[in-house]
Structure formats: structure tokens, C-alpha cells
Amino acid sequence: MSKNQKATLIKVIFLSASGFFLFVCMDSTAKYLGNVMPVTQAVWGRFFFHFIALCIYFLLFKPKLNLTRNFKIQIVRSLLMVTATFFMFNSLQRFDLVDIYVVFFSAPLIVSLLSAYFLKDILSPKGIILMLLSFGSIVYALGPSMKILSPELIFPIIPPLCWALYQFFTKLISGNNEPFSAVFYTAVTGALIFTIYISFNWTPIENNIYWIGLVAMGIFGFI
């Protein structure tokens, strides 16, 4: 392995680990806030302050975007992300975070299957074995701690499905897509939908520290 390849690998590992850490921080904050306010307000804060952070970034750096490119797919991707977040935050109030992540990590398996079927990606024998092992470990880990026949299981199941479809559509347009366009559409779509909803269902926030949590989730989501 060359030095450039090693540097790239280290960068990928660092970014992946950092992204996962931020996801855990956001979900942990959401789990806490869901106990002190309606979940819909926590979801609103995640997207509204994501949008505010995005506006500040655009004012400072003024990146050029083509928001008309792949418009329909961008809207679909944004709705998938908003749906995944809504169900994820709801599932956090019903199950342990570790159990939810066990289910959530089935998303790469779903993405691989979708890519193989629709994009004709070739799955190697090693890849198939790894997917089967992944699925088996998910089923094994799910059984002892979660009620498989519980209707509430729909909440942790929906997020990986939506996330897998989100990644699939991302891969579909990856060669003709600007990364910040996706961030823009996701922030605007989520903020718009939940701002309209909570304007009719707002519950006063009793402690100012909860606002810090809402802002933090928006920043985590933006990063």
C-alpha cells in the first residue's frame, strides 16, 4: 500500500469514526430531550438549527450551488431523511440506544441488495458471506433484548429502510451531484415541515438548557 493510499485510508477511517461519534451525540441528546418535550419539537430543533447553521455557513463561505440539478431525487432523499429522523427519535423513547443501532446497521445490507438489483453492482462471494453474517448477527442481537412481535418495533425498523434508500439515491446521482445541495434540501425540507406542524402544537420549553440541546442537535446534523 502506497503512502497516498494509507493517507486516504486513515482519512476515511477518521471521518467515519467522527461521523458515527456525532450520530451518537445527536441521538443521545434526542433521547434526553424526548423525555422533557414532545418528540416532534426535538425533531424540529434538529432540522431548524441545522438550517440556521447552514445559513451561517453559506453567508461566510458563499459556496455556489445548482439547486435545480436532480431536483426530484433531492426532494425524495430529503423526505427519506426527515422520515428516518422522525422514527429514530420516536424509537429512542421506546428502546435502548444500543438495540436501536443493532437494527439501524442493517442499512448497509439493504443498500447492497438495492445496488445489486437496480444498479447491477456485482456482489462477490465474500461480500455475500459478509452480508449473511451481518444479517445473522442482527437477528441474534435483536432477539434477547427487543420484543420482536411488538407493534412498537416499527419505529426502529423504519429508519434503516429510509436511510438505505437515501444512500441508494445518493449513489444513483453521485456522479452528478453537489454534496451541499443534499444538505440544503434536507435542512429546508425538515425545518419547513416541522415548523408548520409545531406552530399548531407548540409546548413551552421550561428550561433554557433544553434550547442548548436543540441547537447542538442541529449542529451535529449539519456537520
Residue ranges, per PLM feature:
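Transmembrane alpha-helices of multi-pass small-molecule transport proteins
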Residues: 12, 36-83, 162-166, 185-201
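Hydrophobic/small/kink-forming positions within alpha-helical transmembrane segments
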Residues: 20-25, 55, 78-86, 108-113, ...
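C-terminal transmembrane-helix exit sites in multi-pass transporters
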Residues: 88-90, 107-129
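Glycine-/small-residue-enriched transmembrane alpha-helix faces in small-molecule transporters
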Residues: 1-41, 147-172, 216
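Structural motif at transmembrane-helix junctions in multi-pass transporters
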Residues: 35-41, 87-104, 175-180
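Membrane-interface helix termini and inter-helical loops of multi-pass transporters
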Residues: 28-39, 93-96, 139-151, 198-214
